[in-house]
A protein has these predicted regions:
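Short helix/loop capping segments that flank catalytic or ligand/cofactor-binding pockets
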Residues: 71, 98-100, 154-157, 224-227, ...
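Thiamine diphosphate
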Residues: 1-123, 151, 273-422
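A short acidic, amphipathic alpha-helical/loop segment
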Residues: 30-33, 48, 73-77, 225-229, ...
């Protein structure tokens, strides 16, 4: 069973009734295997899930890392306003990134929203983490996040038994409305996060492997890599909140510690005041995704300062460029825009192809659906280029704003009736 299949089994075991998603690598295949309902954008996807939760239905939201930016508003608010039945946000980080406009570490949304995040390392732990996430979500009445990567979804593991988690039918309680926003936040700190901290400390999903005086603290896929090296490893179930007592015991029992995580030094930055802690911040490990060879080399040089090697920035020519689809009907449009004497705003959908060879006709491309708002900020006339999915996702708001402000722009919508850049 691979990680994708383990997640599907967990959703069935947990009797998850409402499943929403927004397509995007690396979670599109996962969401379709989960039979999720596509949503117009990530904010709406989470809001549907919150509504289902309030009325007693377990729900799951599946998004890629950049989707966390859009659903942050209801996510942060739901932490203190409470929920009914369990809500899990299953987020896929595109490490590399292969099909994203930016590399992001979604774990940073956990302390921002003050919500727990589990970061499993292999398919069996992904299955168990999802069940634990629903149990914790209903106990604390808050959403819980679980992070996956393409490596985890593709990893294989045998004998992952089904473990049904019957639905509780728990509905939203209205007691939150008796408190002010300040009072809800106080309660969240005093009661909810204290229970989340204890869940992180006592989770049976934390894994120990003791061997020698050098230890590795790891989460996610790097934990599975570290466990193959025959050294001491503490594989964390939760990236947030971190199990402080567990970490202290492990660190105190070892002379040096390497923190292996990806893509950013999220855990290391919390532990970095201890000079025995090494990792990405100290230059022992590279930023971004990790391979076994990275961890092995770091262990070999853990005693001293790592060699500072000049870094070559990855180029499109080096990595390779997929290009537009051979039968893309918009190639003539992209070529024609290069001849127009006006700035062109694309976005993260198919219109991003206009920024590249052989067209080079779009000047800027930010988030999905951003082109109308960006073009309305140009100093003079401008052109906004977006797909029909980008228009529905968030582009319509930019168009309404441009009309209201009487901005001089031409909006071109690429109608292909599909979210193709996923």
């Amino acid at each position: 069973m691979n990680g994708l299949e383990a997640a599907v089994q967990a959703a069935e075991d947990a009797a998850v009734s409402v499943r929403t998603y927004v397509p995007g690598y690396p979670i599109t295949d996962l969401a379709q295997a989960l039979r999720c309902q596509i949503s117009v954008n990530e904010k709406v996807a989470l809001e549907i899930a919150l509504g289902a939760s309030a009325t007693g239905l377990r729900s799951m939201v599946v998004v890629k890392q950049v989707g966390m930016n859009l659903l942050a508003d209801p996510l942060v608010i739901s932490a203190t306003h409470g929920i009914g039945s369990g809500v899990v946000v299953l987020v896929g980080d595109d490490l590399g990134p292969r099909r994203s406009q930016v590399e992001m570490d979604s774990r940073f949304y956990a302390p921002l929203s003050e919500l727990p995040l589990l970061d499993p390392s292999r398919p069996g732990l992904l299955h168990a983490s999802l069940l634990e996430a629903y149990t914790l979500s209903e106990k604390l009445r808050i959403p819980v996040m679980v992070r996956v990567t393409s490596q985890l979804l593709a990893a294989q593991e045998e004998n992952i038994p089904s473990r049904p988690l019957p639905s509780t039918g728990q509905r939203l309680e209205k007691e939150s409305w008796s408190l002010t926003a300040k009072g809800r936040h106080q309660r969240h700190h005093d009661r909810i996060m204290a229970l989340a901290q204890e869940a992180s400390e006592s989770s049976s999903l934390n894994q120990f492997q003791i061997s020698g005086d050098v230890g590795i603290i790891a989460s996610g896929h790097p934990a599975s890599l570290a466990q193959e090296l025959g050294v001491s490893v503490l594989a964390l179930a939760y990236s947030y909140p971190l199990p402080e007592r567990l970490l202290r015991r492990f660190i105190d029992g070892h002379r040096l510690i390497l923190v292996a995580e990806e893509p950013e030094p999220f855990i290391e930055s919390i532990l970095s005041q201890n000079p025995r802690i090494k990792g990405k911040l100290t230059g022992h490990l590279p930023r971004g995704a990790l391979e076994s060879s990275d961890i092995i080399q770091a262990l070999e040089k853990l005693e001293g300062r790592p060699d500072k090697m000049p870094q070559a920035y990855e180029s499109v020519a080096e990595r390779g460029y997929e290009g537009v689809c051979p039968d893309c009907p918009f190639q003539v449009l992209f070529s024609s825009l290069a001849k127009v004497d006006a700035p062109v705003a694309g976005d993260a959908g198919c219109s991003i192809q206009a920024t590249r060879q052989p067209f080079c006709s779009a000047d800027v491309a930010y988030g999905l659906g951003s082109s109308a708002a960006v073009a309305s900020g140009f100093s003079g006339k401008g052109i906004a280029l977006m797909g029909d999915y980008a228009l529905a996702h968030s582009g319509l708001a930019g168009l309404i704003n441009a009309v209201w402000q009487k901005r001089d722009l031409l909006a071109v919508v690429l109608k292909n009736e599909v979210a193709a850049m996923t």
